[in-house]
């Protein structure tokens, strides 16, 4: 506050400029003291008289151009807090933060005469006891963090959970997992060349069986292989394939039977030369004959009924024709009779 009350030599009022620079004085421009001192021959610039008393003004030729000896009022010492801490730039560039030891910011020693009240006020507001200093972090690499995981800095952000392991490489073909007993797998692998998968089957009670992304087409179709997704069921095996692998079918006792086996169980195999087959065929033939005879009888009955209805219709038509002829003759008779007979017949 003393700096505002007591005039600083930098802010002392200068002698009034010539009339050419009067507009600059109104716009709050001041002349630099060192430039005016050079203009007056190395002596200090004389103090300007009050505004009501006009004083001598230096000539225009001694001051030179306008831009060299003029400057605006600088309010930066009053607006920028002197004690505000400055955060240092990060030292290392990497992926994680590491707390760096912060050195205390040097506080300039303020004298009693030139102590700035506004600077002290701003320093209390922005960098004082009410504001906490922001943490300063450097960077540390992930490799160094993984190597020295146990001896981390107290301020370092350690991950809450360990990073997940990298995913396994994707398989080339889609596989549908299936399980089968390990002893069956061992039996199959014993006869096959290269028992690489036998070790896997020996370690587990059930070995993993994979259906590849293609399946065999039934023998009736016109192709050998057909691609299908893993969600589609496997194709129906042909009878030749079912007979080719009896040992494998015996191993899969817990699995559902093949559709061909279900059909064979449902349909009995009967010898055509046996008496039972002959009796059954005779019974079937008799039943077919009876049904055919019944159909013929129904057909004959229908035809007979149609004939009866046709004859009745003809009789009715003949009767209608007869009645119509009678009506016409009676009408003609009534037309030929004289009027007196008609009048007498009317009275009767």
Swiss-Prot record:
A GO MF label: DNA binding
Sites where a glycan is attached: 228-229
Cross-link for Glycyl lysine isopeptide (Lys-Gly) (interchain with G-Cter in SUMO), residue positions: 174
Gene Ontology biological-process entries: cell differentiation; defense response to bacterium; DNA-templated transcription; hepatocyte proliferation; liver regeneration; negative regulation of T cell proliferation; negative regulation of transcription by RNA polymerase II; ovarian follicle development
Entries under InterPro entries matching the protein: bZIP (IPR004827), bZIP_sf (IPR046347), C/EBP (IPR031106), C/EBP_chordates (IPR016468)
Chain intervals for the UniProt region annotation (Leucine-zipper): 300-307
Position of the Glycyl lysine isopeptide (Lys-Gly) (interchain with G-Cter in SUMO2) cross-link: 133, 174, 185, 187, 263, 265, 335
Chain segments carrying region Required for Lys-174 sumoylation: 1-24
Main location: nucleus
SUPFAM superfamilies cross-referenced by the UniProt entry: Leucine zipper domain
Sites bearing N6-methylated lysine, chain numbering: 43
Biased composition regions of type Basic and acidic residues, renumbered to the chain: 268-277
One term under GO cellular component: cytoplasm
Region (Basic motif): 278-298
Ranges spanned by the short sequence motif 9aaTAD, renumbered to the chain: 116-124
Compositional bias annotation for Pro residues: 47-59, 160-171
Oligomer and partners: Binds DNA as a homodimer and as a heterodimer. Interacts with ATF4. Binds DNA as a heterodimer with ATF4. Interacts with MYB; within the complex, MYB and CEBPB bind to different promoter regions. Can form stable heterodimers with CEBPA, CEBPD and CEBPG. Interacts with SIX1. Interacts with TRIM28 and PTGES2. Interacts with PRDM16. Interacts with CCDC85B. Forms a complex with THOC5. Interacts with ZNF638; this interaction increases transcriptional activation. Interacts with CIDEA and CIDEC; these interactions increase transcriptional activation of a subset of CEBPB downstream target genes.
Function: Important transcription factor regulating the expression of genes involved in immune and inflammatory responses. Also plays a significant role in adipogenesis, as well as in the gluconeogenic pathway, liver regeneration, and hematopoiesis. The consensus recognition site is 5'-T[TG]NNGNAA[TG]-3'. Its functional capacity is governed by protein interactions and post-translational protein modifications. During early embryogenesis, plays essential and redundant roles with CEBPA.
PANTHER family on file: CCAAT/ENHANCER BINDING PROTEIN (PTHR23334), CCAAT_ENHANCER-BINDING PROTEIN BETA (PTHR23334:SF21)
Protein name: CCAAT/enhancer-binding protein beta
Organism for this UniProt entry: Bos taurus
């Amino acid at each position: 506050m003393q700096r505002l009350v007591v005039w600083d030599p930098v802010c002392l009022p200068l002698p009034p400029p010539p009339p050419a620079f009067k507009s600059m004085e109104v716009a709050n421009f001041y002349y630099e003291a060192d430039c005016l001192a050079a203009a007056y021959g190395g002596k200090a610039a004389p103090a300007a008289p009050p505004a009501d008393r006009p004083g001598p003004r230096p000539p225009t030729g001694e001051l030179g151009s306008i831009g060299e000896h003029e400057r605006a009022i600088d309010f930066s010492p009053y607006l920028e807090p002197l004690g505000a801490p400055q955060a240092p730039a990060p030292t290392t560039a990497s992926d994680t933060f590491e707390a760096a030891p912060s050195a205390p910011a040097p506080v300039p020693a303020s004298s009693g005469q030139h102590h700035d009240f506004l600077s002290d006020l701003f320093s209390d507001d922005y960098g004082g006891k009410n504001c906490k200093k922001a943490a300063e972090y450097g960077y540390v690499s992930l490799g160094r963090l993984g190597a020295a995981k146990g001896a981390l800095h107290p301020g370092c952000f350690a991950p809450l959970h360990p990073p997940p392991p990298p995913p396994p490489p994707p398989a080339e073909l889609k596989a549908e997992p299936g399980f089968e007993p390990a002893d069956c797998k061992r039996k199959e692998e014993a006869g096959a060349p290269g028992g690489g998968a036998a070790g896997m089957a020996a370690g587990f009670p059930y070995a993993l069986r994979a259906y590849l992304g293609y399946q065999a087409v039934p023998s009736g179709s016109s192709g050998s292989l057909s691609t299908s997704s893993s969600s589609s069921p496997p194709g129906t095996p042909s009878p030749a394939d079912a007979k080719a692998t009896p040992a494998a079918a015996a191993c899969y006792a817990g699995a559902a039977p093949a559709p061909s086996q279900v059909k064979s169980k449902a349909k009995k195999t009967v010898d055509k030369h046996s008496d039972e087959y002959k009796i059954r065929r005779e019974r079937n033939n008799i039943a077919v004959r009876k049904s055919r005879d019944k159909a013929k009888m129904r057909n004959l009955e229908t035809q007979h009924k149609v004939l009866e209805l046709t004859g009745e219709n003809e009789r009715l038509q003949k009767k209608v024709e007869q009645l119509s002829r009678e009506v016409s003759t009676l009408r003609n008779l009534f037309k030929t009779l004289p009027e007196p007979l008609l009048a007498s017949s009317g009275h009767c």
